[in-house]
Amino acid sequence: MKKIDVKILDPRVGQQFPLPTYATSGSAGLDLRACLDDAVELAPGATTLVPTGLAIHIADPSLAAVMLPRSGLGHKHGIVLGNLVGLIDSDYQGQLMVSIWNRGQDSFTIEPGERIAQMVFVPVVQAEFNLVEAFDATERGEGGFGHSGRK
């Protein structure tokens, strides 16, 4: 199994705040926590950057990571990622910050140590571009939006 080097920058991680974990053996996402000194109140429509206390260097160009919102925060409170999905390239070497957006109607308080996002490692396939005049014909052709029907 491939291992990814995740450095802990904030000494509170593993002490005051739990180490990042997978909630179950079948979890794809690794929970990320708000590494804050004090609670942060986020007004409706507002965004803020929240540190995780972690730094990462994936190093393998065949891998990347994506940061995703936690479903409960989005559904129950309107708390999602400000950039919708965070992409972490294999050559990035800095701290993981989470852009949090309150799209809800009420203020929301982010507590120190609260699980705020999840990170999933994914394979990467880079495109190779070739100039062509046309594609080989297929049954579908250029049929786009709704072309294959609803049933």
Curated annotation (Swiss-Prot):
It catalyses: dUTP + H2O = dUMP + diphosphate + H(+). The gene is dut. Belongs to the dUTPase family. This is Deoxyuridine 5'-triphosphate nucleotidohydrolase. SUPFAM superfamilies: dUTPase-like. One of its GO terms (molecular function) is dUTP diphosphatase activity. This enzyme is involved in nucleotide metabolism: it produces dUMP, the immediate precursor of thymidine nucleotides and it decreases the intracellular concentration of dUTP so that uracil cannot be incorporated into DNA. PANTHER family: DEOXYURIDINE 5'-TRIPHOSPHATE NUCLEOTIDOHYDROLASE.
